[in-house]
Design a protein with these regions (language model features):
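Short periplasmic/luminal acceptor-recognition loop of GT-C membrane glycosyltransferases, typified by
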Residues: 432-470, 489, 494-500, 525
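Short hydrophobic/aromatic helix or loop-helix immediately within or flanking a transmembrane segment
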Residues: 125-152
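Membrane-interface alpha helices of multi-pass inner-membrane proteins
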Residues: 87, 187-191, 208-213, 220-234, ...
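Transmembrane catalytic cores of multi-pass membrane glycosyltransferases
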Residues: 111, 237-333, 363
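Periplasmic/luminal catalytic loop of GT-C fold multi-pass membrane glycosyltransferases
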Residues: 471-523
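Transmembrane-helix motifs of polytopic, lipid-linked glycan transferases
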Residues: 156-174
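Membrane-proximal, lumen/periplasm-facing interface regions of secretory-pathway glyco-
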Residues: 383-434, 443-445, 452, 463, ...
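Membrane-interface transmembrane helices that cradle and orient dolichyl/undecaprenyl
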Residues: 207-220, 322-330
Length: 527
């Protein structure tokens, strides 16, 4: 039976007083002696001649030894596997959003035309207007995935982006694997609310990539990350919040080299202008955000403390701030990487409080920050810990097979939950009998842009090209049943595609409009 041996360096500042744990069977005693020599060498500051890969949450053996293959299936890997299988399953079964579909249409048009689309060509209300398409690269990439494998590949690609971001979160976390697992599992509940396949998935990956580069002080890679990010999603502005926090910590710790942080920041700013928008990027994106906050768009609302899922965000945020305040006197002795994590999490927290879509990025940073703040030291005394590698392997394999089969079954049967065919074929036929121009809601416009490409829509999920007055009139019509006649007359509307629950349906029916299609969800009407 293997014995759990704990080696804790006595005050070695160079290894941050962490306890290093290795499971050492008797036949690897010689290798374990190398571990002890390695630690002593590190503490003394002398040159370490024996290569060793050791970590607080990894099993360590000498490279010259031949470990039992079963030792690979540790409890740590067991928990990590279950966690990431849950992420893959949740992402893989996320419903397709209307935004994803108009983005696929834009990606297809740019793929075919070989130029970036910066004017509206999808609506009859803003046709030809300027459209600050700051997500053009993500749209093209998603369409490339669609060409390769259809909507399943689009979903799986977004899954890879999101899982990659959480893998960095897991990599930056410290402490016992049970604690890391617990914090991550709690964070996944509110964070998973916005995992649909769309450009936001790029931001989830790039947020953690930026944090990782700041923590590891690999600053030269940051401009490259920002030039790609700025062409994929407007969430790059959140990246600049993180960048300012991380470089601010570096400047405070090494004020004499402030100019290095300034150069890195300048490089990232210049990288963000390397987009089709050019310098107007710095005016168009803030204007877009200001317009968004004036509309009741769900993902831009504040997190609701009464919602059982979003409540966990508040719990983690309060725990993080409270722990940070309680340990404020000891922060001067914290490692630079830990201080960077704390600063980045604090910087992103206000954005998460203001908009629920930023809850995920905050939690991805807060998890490793919390594990660092509440790091549990292991006792020096050796204790027994039972490893069950065969059981771990069996459960991991069973879970992986179950997740794979579930996703394959869902994709093969195109279950309604996926929303891959949200517009019924009969409704599309009815639309063909309907004269221009069309009226539809903001929420469903993306569906029509993709599934009815020959029709110009009234609105879709791109709020940028549309006049604010048009958006506000539409909101009144669909929330309080405002008068539709002025808008219909102004835009020459003679056809409507609406959900059956829309208050406009009742008004049009009362006014004598003819029903061309009707089911429990959708209605097509004409005058």
């Amino acid at each position: 039976m293997p014995y759990l041996t704990t080696v804790s360096p006595a005050g070695g500042a160079s290894i941050a007083n962490l306890s290093f744990v290795s499971v050492v069977p008797p036949r690897f005693a010689a290798s374990h002696a190398a571990v002890r020599r390695h630690l002593r060498n590190g503490i003394d500051g002398s040159v370490i001649s024996e290569p060793l890969f050791v970590g607080y949450r990894t099993t360590s053996l000498s490279p010259t030894s031949t470990p039992d293959r079963a030792s690979f299936y540790t409890y740590e890997r067991f928990l990590a596997t279950l966690l990431f299988l849950a992420i893959i399953l949740a992402c893989g079964l996320m419903p397709m959003q209307p935004d994803t579909l108009w983005q696929l249409r834009a990606g297809r048009d740019m793929w075919q035309s070989q130029h970036v689309l910066l004017t509206d060509v999808y609506s009859h209300t803003a046709y030809g207007s300027f459209w600050p398409n700051h997500e053009w690269l993500a749209e093209v990439i998603y369409y490339a995935m669609y060409r390769f494998g259809g909507l399943p590949m689009v979903t799986l690609f977004a899954t890879a982006l999101i899982a990659g971001g959480w893998a960095i979160t897991w990599r930056l976390a410290k402490g016992p694997v049970r604690a890391v697992f617990a914090w991550t599992a709690l964070a996944l509940v509110p964070a998973s609310l916005w995992w649909e396949p769309r450009p936001h998935a790029f931001s989830l990956l790039f947020v953690m990539t930026t944090v990782f580069l700041l923590v590891r002080r690999r600053y030269l890679w940051l401009p490259l990350v920002f030039v790609v990010w700025a062409n994929c999603h407007g969430g790059v502005l959140l990246g600049f919040v993180i960048l300012a926090a991380g470089l601010g910590v570096r400047t405070l710790m090494a004020p004499r080299v402030w100019w290095q942080a300034a150069l890195i920041g300048l490089g990232c700013v210049l990288a963000a202008t390397a987009t089709p928008l050019g310098l107007s990027f710095w005016t168009e994106i803030p204007k877009s955000l200001m317009r968004i906050h004036s509309y009741p768009i769900d993902e831009w609302r504040r997190p609701n403390v009464m919602d059982v899922h979003e409540l966990l965000f508040w719990v983690i945020a309060i725990a993080f701030c409270g722990t940070l305040f309680r340990k404020r006197r000891t922060l001067s002795g914290a490692a630079a990487g830990d201080l960077t994590l704390y600063a980045c999490a604090l910087a992103v927290l206000p954005t998460a409080i203001l908009a629920v879509r930023n809850v995920g990025p905050f939690l991805m940073i807060a998890v490793p920050a919390m594990t660092s703040l509440v790091l549990v030291r292991r006792e020096r005394a050796a204790r027994r810990e039972t490893q069950r590698p065969l059981l771990n392997l069996a459960v991991m394999s069973s879970a992986a097979i179950a997740v794979t089969m579930t996703i394959v079954w869902a994709y093969r049967n195109e279950i309604p939950h996926l929303h891959w065919a949200p517009v019924p074929a009969s409704a599309l036929v009815a639309l063909g009998q309907c004269p221009d121009n069309l009226y539809n809601r903001y929420d469903e416009g993306g569906y029509l842009v993709w599934f009815a490409p020959d029709r110009k829509v009234f609105l879709d999920g791109r709020q940028d090209p549309y006049p604010p007055d048009l958006m506000r009139d539409h909101i009144r019509m669909e929330t309080v049943g405002g008068d539709y006649k002025a808008a219909f007359s102004r835009y020459g509307i003679h056809c409507a595609y609406l959900p059956a629950v829309s208050p406009t349906v009742a008004q049009l029916s009362t006014s004598g409009w003819k029903t061309l299609y009707h089911d429990s969800q959708w209605v097509v009407l004409r005058d």
